[in-house]
Amino acid sequence: AKEVIHLTDKVGTEIVGLQLSELTDQQKDELALLIAERVVVFFRDQKLSPQAQWDLGDYYGNIEVHPQAPHVTGLPGATVIWNDYKIKQGLDLNFNNINFGNWDSVRHPAIGNNVWHTDLVHERQPAGYTHLHLDAIPETGGDTMWISNYAAYDKLSDEFKKFLDGKKAVYVSAHSYLNRKDPLGGPKKVERIHPLVRTHPATGWKYLAVNRVMTTRILGLSPIESDMVLNFLFDVCEKNADIQVRFKWTNTKPGYGTSAIWDNRVSQHRNVWDHEGK
């Protein structure tokens, strides 16, 4: 790399002078550890096709195929989140069972991407790395923000850490799904129980596994106690600017885009919806 720029002390690094499509296996391994440590890593001026993006994800493990998101034909897991992409790019996409095309759901702060969240927390093994590549970027606005849940945990007192360690919480899916055992019962949210504090398998660092949208209650506490503790933890994450990074996407030359790759397990993210019509 020509340059490695740490955007903040706790979270966010930009790599200059490398093409993701040309990384050696050793570089891919080093990048994986860097993402685990820095939470999110950015690459501008990337010549990256959907196939090359998919291949990089496939190197790291099984690619998550979202059941409700459109994907590039032949590349399950190469999700498209821009509802005009098929028209603009001429790609053949699968839009079956898709609600991402309804941008009211994105703009609405209660259910959309402009509220802090972690993806797929309801799964037995929540998604590891997420790779977002943008080929079209508005002239202004559309920033994306990340929180380091490592740093959020580190802000807690030792006594409070002891209180939280071993506690489990209930996590709910962002979307509703049909139960194949009861298809006539209608779509329902999926709930899963996970530890509230977890340890990253690569770094060995503890992190706080909460987000305001999908962490609903702590087991073993009364509803009032659970709400009080969770709201405090949400505030620790959301109100401490020193554990956050805000990334500004910038236009590059035609045919090139910008990539962000983050560790979904140890982070929260949100967009800033100020670019409608741009």
Name these PLM-found stretches.
Residues 2-261, 265-278:
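Fe(II)/2-oxoglutarate oxygenase catalytic core
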